[in-house]
Amino acid sequence: ARELLESGQPFLFGRCGATEMRTVADYLQNGGKNFDDSTREDIRNLSGVFPTDDATLEKFCCIYVKCAQNAELLALWNVGAEREVIRGCDATRFTELRALEPYYHAKPWSAALAGKRVLVVHPFRKTILAQYARRAQLFPGKNVLPEFASLTVVQAVQGLGGQDTGYASWFDALAAMEREMDAADYDVAI
């Protein structure tokens, strides 16, 4: 990860969500139809994807698979559903989820973010900004969270547990976040 960050070349590292992977596996096993009721419930309540009709879930799964297949690196949970999803990821390298957590490494990949314009898309916007301001206290003596040229945090839409997001669909929420990302000036998006 660090080498790619330092190279300046575009790349995609992905972290696969467990419920998302189960939904995609269900899609691949059933030809995109007849999603299991528990799959619909989990993808809505645990991942915030809505509505959970076949057309929405099929569109979600197609995008998810395409992203996985185009990723340079995927971090996996090592759950059974992943086997179905990663079959078509011929050029993708895989790692365990923990490998993306920089504080576990003597030479953290995140050190390569020093001096870069960093965009973070996350539901905990305020917390991230507050913690970044205290970065020297978080990991003393380690280069886990260096000083960035700038930090922009886009508030991720969070629709877990069926909570109202103010959007008609997960795709409408995604489009709004994409517009905010497109308006930001950044070198690296997390």
Question: For the regions a protein language model found, what residue spans apply to each?
Answer:
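A mid-sequence, solvent-exposed acidic-amphipathic segment
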Residues: 147-188
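Electropositive, gly/pro-rich neighborhoods at or near active sites that engage anionic ligands
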Residues: 1-150
